[in-house]
Amino acid sequence: MASVPVYCLCRLPYDVTRFMIECDVCQDWFHGSCVGVEEDKAAEIDLYHCPNCQVTHGPSVMRKRRGAVKHADVGLGRDSGRPVKTGSAQFVRELRCRTFPSADEVLLKPTGAQLTVEFLEERSFSVPVLVLRKDGLGMNLPPSSFSVTDVEHYIGTEKEIDVIDVSRQADLKMKLGEFVEYYNSPNRDRVLNVISLEFSDTRLSNLVETPKIVRKLSWVENLWPEESIFERPNVQKYCLMGVKDSYTDFHIDFGGTSVWYHVLRGEKIFYLIRPTAANLSLFERWSSSSNQNELFFGDQVDMCYKCSVKQGNTLFIPTGWIHAVLTPVDCLAFGGNFLHSLNIDMQLRAYEIEKRLSTADLFKFPNFETVCWYVGKHLLDTFRGLRENRRHPATYLVHGAKALNNAFRGWTRKESLGEHEQEIPDTIKTQQLVKDLAKEIRLVEDIFQQNIGRSGTPFGGSQGLPSPHPKAQLNTPLTFSQHLSKKRGPKPKEAFGGGGVGPPGAKKKSQKGKEIKTEAGELDLLEIHTKHTLKKFQPGCKVKKSKLELPDDCLDDFEEKINKSKLKLVLTNGKLQGKKGRAGSANGAGSSLQQFQPHMATLSDFDSEDELQIDETPPPRRRPSLPSKKKLAGLPRKLPRAKPCSDPHRIREPGEVDFDIEEDYTTDEEMLTMQGVKGGAGGILDLLKASKQVAGLDSALSEEAPASPSTRDAIQGMLSMANPPSSSSSSSSSSPLSISGGGEMMGLMKEKGGREGWMSGVKKSERKAVFQRPGKRPIKRPARHLSDDESLDEQETLGTCFKDSDYVYPSLESDEEDHVSKSKMKRKRNWDDTPWSPKARVTPTLPKQERPVREGARVASVETGLAAAAAKLAQQEQQKTITKRKYTKKKTPQEKVHSTVAQLQHQPDSAPVSPPLPSEPPVDCIVEERRVEVYSASLLDHEYTAGPGPFSPGGPRGSGAMAPGVFLTSRRPSLSPQNSSSYSPSAPSPGGLVTPTSAGACQGKRPKKGLATAKQRLGKILKIHRNGKLLL
């Protein structure tokens, strides 16, 4: 077995942890500690002679300095051919003499108690923060008498540390005991600086506690799992020991981390550069240049600020700030780095710059990508939780999540997965996380766009400090709740012409454009609603900066009552729910609101494009109500309301906005009972008023403006087609709502341009509308996102029902849990429900596409519709011909022949059918014909449901209801509008109409092709295609 080679005077084997130097004479290796050669000084030796060789060859030969320059002849290095090196004594002297802009221009200087998460959220932590005293910061530090000797005592003399040789800007390793000896020596031959002594795992850690704000924001402190197989990054606690004239060149802290410094003894001077896109590009170019140590980066940027941190001061430097540090006197300081969620995008940009510059691992954030994966999972859970609780994340959190998700996509690409795979935790499913996080971000952005509007920058530009009052005032423009929709809602500070109604003792600012600070705990919800209303209902004559002028007495009275009552209200399903014992106050405030009604009556209509927005995440079994064309006076509906945290004990998490955003889900019926209805004659309200006798509307509605006779006839025809016995339609049992189970209706919507469109109604909780305006495409309301399970259940439930492709059938929501209460509500609501719905769907008429036709196939619903139309027309003819005026006209010879043959073949129970070519009917008959034609389409769209009528067991004819699939030819002849007695002037009686039953019965002119039989003519009149579908 070969022996292990030994070296040096001590004749020990090679030790990789000990510095060794080779003798240039005997070629033997010696430990530096054994021959008295320090590692940092070895570079100055040109030829080394070991102690044995020094006897024969003399001492070691040192390197000669070439072209030594006298410092007195050098300015900034520009007067001579050789520039000044960074960190040299001349460089430090020149740096001390230079003038820089003061950092007071950009610094924030709060007290320790004011520096909270909310403080940094409002200002996005985008500028440095200097705290003059440590009181209130929540950190523990040794006393000011603590020295480097004490550091050695708590950490250990043999602790190997990284030291920077300032003059050469090079790294070297030393034992802590050696550095302390150098630090305490009066004669120092060089300048050494310690900036990377992390002591989290030492006894010194028990004496130092990081600031409370750092512990709250730090990713590693809060999100790093204890069971992680990766090594926990320890970058929170550093001890910085520097002697006079120590200098650290410009840099960005690793991983884009933010950093805190507290000077325990001495002083440090920071040179700060803002991380703009241009400055970051210049920094990357400067860092990769070959003459970096000859260029002062502060000369290449527009602004370099100087900030002096004295003993007892604490400085917080935000993400990405480029900074250099000069130590004018011996200094002992503590600091640390931390990642946070306030500026994720900048952290990732700094990390990418590090990678492009090939930074050594020693100066990188350990396991940076692993931390990011844990944070991504946390953000996904946060977004889901906030959305389920109807609370919204702050803007900076959404932007940070988007940047983080984009980084995840880059790290998991096939071509780059190899170099990033080792930092991915095993508990993270990367592809699923990227997909789910992108979905949550999309949902949040949709909510922002529809309910709150697109906000500009995440935070306002104000840098003012909160009031030192114990109840810190909330700088409202800096919270996300201020960014309400520019289209749909005002900012709370703009209501009442810029003056807010605040709690007693609160200061008021009437100057325009100034921010109004309101104490969060004192905000009145009713006041916010009123401010929303006054801002929303602005006169149409002024597009911008218009204010609603109200009498001073109304405002004073309203303000006085609010201040007296101190209302604390919660909006539940559009109803004001006050606390116990405050009903009288609520009523008083409601009476004050009534004073505003006369002034709101002059407000103009709103553009429907601004109003057709709904929340995508309403509560489960409830759909938000839609605003009508005419906005009802009073409190606004579907407006996001900024409400302080309803739970006084709720702790707002970082990244959550201070205000809850709430929507109003008041139904149309509730709004009609609470507020007056305003509309013009000939509009939609005329249809409601004309049908009040059927739907049980309040008689006060019809007294304002009576409907025209034609409109009333149209309504009566519509109701009679939906339910044959029109005489009993006023009762709840025979109304069209009760026939279809109390939840469906048909309506006729008259639009602004005078056109009429059909609306097929659905349940109030399921309405979605498309308002068709003249000359414009339909405006559709965005539907809320349904889960996959809900969609599948609806499709399975409705899959067997007949559906016409020309109509859109809104989905039905499940109500298994509360079907009992809903059924009671339906029965109670049937008697006063209206036949017109502003939320019914009206779809545009599109060209029909060719479909495959099966020969001999018959559609059951079409046959049923034909039977219903024929029976109804027969009953109408019998009723109308009794009182109608008979029109006699001279018959043509051909008509006489038809009349004679028909009378010979007439049977008592035969259905009346007109000749193929009837003469022109009177005007009244034409109106009736058009109405019946249109209603036939709606009958075919809905399955016929039996009720008290001619086809029911209790009907006049005594026959059962027409079942689907039973054809007209086997029951009774068909009836068409043109075959009624009102169109046949020659008809002697309602039952004496002519019926050509065979080709031989009529000896006159041969009928047209396709019109030979009654069924063909009826199909032609009703515009039914041969395959049983409607032709629109």
Curated annotation (Swiss-Prot):
<feature type="compositionally biased region" description="Basic and acidic residues">
    <location>
        <begin position="644"/>
        <end position="655"/>
    </location>
</feature>
<dbReference type="Pfam" id="PF02373">
    <property type="entry name" value="JmjC"/>
</dbReference>
<keyword id="KW-0805">Transcription regulation</keyword>
<keyword id="KW-0804">Transcription</keyword>
<feature type="compositionally biased region" description="Low complexity">
    <location>
        <begin position="699"/>
        <end position="710"/>
    </location>
</feature>
<dbReference type="GO" id="GO:0003712">
    <property type="term" value="F:transcription coregulator activity"/>
</dbReference>
<dbReference type="InterPro" id="IPR011011">
    <property type="entry name" value="Znf_FYVE_PHD"/>
</dbReference>
<comment type="function">
    <text>Histone lysine demethylase with selectivity for the di- and monomethyl states that plays a key role cell cycle progression, rDNA transcription and brain development. Demethylates mono- and dimethylated histone H3 'Lys-9' residue (H3K9Me1 and H3K9Me2), dimethylated H3 'Lys-27' (H3K27Me2) and monomethylated histone H4 'Lys-20' residue (H4K20Me1). Acts as a transcription activator as H3K9Me1, H3K9Me2, H3K27Me2 and H4K20Me1 are epigenetic repressive marks. Involved in cell cycle progression by being required to control G1-S transition.</text>
</comment>
<feature type="compositionally biased region" description="Basic residues">
    <location>
        <begin position="620"/>
        <end position="632"/>
    </location>
</feature>
<dbReference type="GO" id="GO:0045893">
    <property type="term" value="P:positive regulation of DNA-templated transcription"/>
</dbReference>
<dbReference type="Pfam" id="PF00628">
    <property type="entry name" value="PHD"/>
</dbReference>
<dbReference type="GO" id="GO:0140683">
    <property type="term" value="F:histone H3K9me/H3K9me2 demethylase activity"/>
</dbReference>
<feature type="region of interest" description="Disordered">
    <location>
        <begin position="697"/>
        <end position="857"/>
    </location>
</feature>
<feature type="compositionally biased region" description="Basic residues">
    <location>
        <begin position="882"/>
        <end position="891"/>
    </location>
</feature>
<dbReference type="GO" id="GO:0043523">
    <property type="term" value="P:regulation of neuron apoptotic process"/>
</dbReference>
<dbReference type="GO" id="GO:0003682">
    <property type="term" value="F:chromatin binding"/>
</dbReference>
<keyword id="KW-0539">Nucleus</keyword>
<feature type="binding site">
    <location>
        <position position="253"/>
    </location>
    <ligand>
        <name>Fe cation</name>
    </ligand>
</feature>
<keyword id="KW-0560">Oxidoreductase</keyword>
<dbReference type="InterPro" id="IPR001965">
    <property type="entry name" value="Znf_PHD"/>
</dbReference>
<dbReference type="InterPro" id="IPR050690">
    <property type="entry name" value="JHDM1_Histone_Demethylase"/>
</dbReference>
<keyword id="KW-0408">Iron</keyword>
<dbReference type="GO" id="GO:0140002">
    <property type="term" value="F:histone H3K4me3 reader activity"/>
</dbReference>
<feature type="region of interest" description="Disordered">
    <location>
        <begin position="577"/>
        <end position="660"/>
    </location>
</feature>
<dbReference type="GO" id="GO:0061188">
    <property type="term" value="P:negative regulation of rDNA heterochromatin formation"/>
</dbReference>
<dbReference type="GO" id="GO:0032452">
    <property type="term" value="F:histone demethylase activity"/>
</dbReference>
<feature type="region of interest" description="Disordered">
    <location>
        <begin position="455"/>
        <end position="515"/>
    </location>
</feature>
<dbReference type="GO" id="GO:0048703">
    <property type="term" value="P:embryonic viscerocranium morphogenesis"/>
</dbReference>
<feature type="region of interest" description="Disordered">
    <location>
        <begin position="875"/>
        <end position="923"/>
    </location>
</feature>
<dbReference type="GO" id="GO:0035575">
    <property type="term" value="F:histone H4K20 demethylase activity"/>
</dbReference>
<feature type="domain" description="JmjC">
    <location>
        <begin position="199"/>
        <end position="355"/>
    </location>
</feature>
<dbReference type="GO" id="GO:0060319">
    <property type="term" value="P:primitive erythrocyte differentiation"/>
</dbReference>
<dbReference type="GO" id="GO:0051864">
    <property type="term" value="F:histone H3K36 demethylase activity"/>
</dbReference>
<keyword id="KW-0862">Zinc</keyword>
<feature type="region of interest" description="Disordered">
    <location>
        <begin position="943"/>
        <end position="1015"/>
    </location>
</feature>
<dbReference type="GO" id="GO:0032454">
    <property type="term" value="F:histone H3K9 demethylase activity"/>
</dbReference>
<feature type="binding site">
    <location>
        <position position="323"/>
    </location>
    <ligand>
        <name>Fe cation</name>
    </ligand>
</feature>
<dbReference type="Pfam" id="PF17811">
    <property type="entry name" value="JHD"/>
</dbReference>
<keyword id="KW-0010">Activator</keyword>
<dbReference type="GO" id="GO:0000082">
    <property type="term" value="P:G1/S transition of mitotic cell cycle"/>
</dbReference>
<dbReference type="InterPro" id="IPR041070">
    <property type="entry name" value="JHD"/>
</dbReference>
<dbReference type="GO" id="GO:0005730">
    <property type="term" value="C:nucleolus"/>
</dbReference>
